[in-house]
Amino acid sequence: MNLLGIDFEDWYHPELIKKHHNLKSCEPLIVNGIDKIIDWLRKNDTYATFFVVGELLKFKPELVDQILENGHEIGFHTMHHTRLDEPNYREIFSEELKEFSELTNKKSKGFRAPSFSLSKSTSWMIEILEFHGYVYDSSVVPVKTKLYGIKNAQTTPYKISSSSIDKNDSSGKLIEFPLLTTNFLTKQIPAGGGFYLRVLPLSIIRSAIKSMNAINSPSTFYIHSWELTPEFMPKLNMPLIDHFITYHNLHKAYGKLDSLLKLYNFTSFEKFIK
């Protein structure tokens, strides 16, 4: 069994878009794709965890019922897609958790940091999640890239703590589900979704999933809601590299993940833990 997390965020949330565009008071568009995503999961007999940016639940409260009543799970992705290393965010994080809990009727037990921004300097979030009764986190990419990642972190699920974010701590209370990685041309790279789903050949991703399953470990996979609904994603002007990372093969993400769901079993984090 493998794990599928959908980072449910809108078109103005991605870090590379915010980096180049001062977008305030934007109208959400990607939320209009929720029916398409739910129907797609139903057709594939697959359950997923929706890591939702909380402000979208305030804009469209019915999202909660749409997700939960179809057997899926809601996880926390901060209220405004804020990186953990933003100045003074530590003081705000607890209040956002409380607000999200109210919006979801205390249903959320899992967290994913925007842009996988968990690091030694932001490990404070683990103790706060524990205090609020959270069960797991999925913010570790066990390879270092220019945008995110923790070099040499454990690649299979482990107990995480604020003093040990990269390997098992038997005293840890939270389960960490690190994202899938693989070896490519002698180098370890991410393979668990997003840009890497769009750019890597499916044969490499299939091989990575098989390797994890061969050691009785789930492959943790993710995709952004805007990658599943590119028809709602506006094309914005950005520098060449950032434009490439955001938009390259955007139209292929849905089909590539669909083929993986037909080959391998995926479920939500909640159902896997149970």
Task: Give each language-model segment a name.
Residues 44-122, 134, 139-146, 172:
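Metal-dependent polysaccharide deacetylase catalytic core of the NodB/CE4 family, i.e.
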Residues 9-11, 55-57, 80-81, 116-118, ...:
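Short, solvent-exposed loop/turn segments at secondary-structure junctions
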Residues 1-70:
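Active-site beta->alpha N-cap acidic-glycine motif
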Residues 34-38, 61-65, 93-101, 126, ...:
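Generic structural signal for well-ordered alpha-helices
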Residues 106, 113-216:
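Active-site-adjacent pocket scaffolds in enzyme catalytic domains
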Residues 43-45, 199-274:
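C-terminal domain-boundary segment and adjacent tail
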Residues 7, 41, 74-77, 111, ...:
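Conserved, mostly hydrophobic/aromatic
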Residues 21-28, 47, 51-53, 79-88, ...:
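The substrate-binding groove and active-site-proximal loops of carbohydrate-active enzymes
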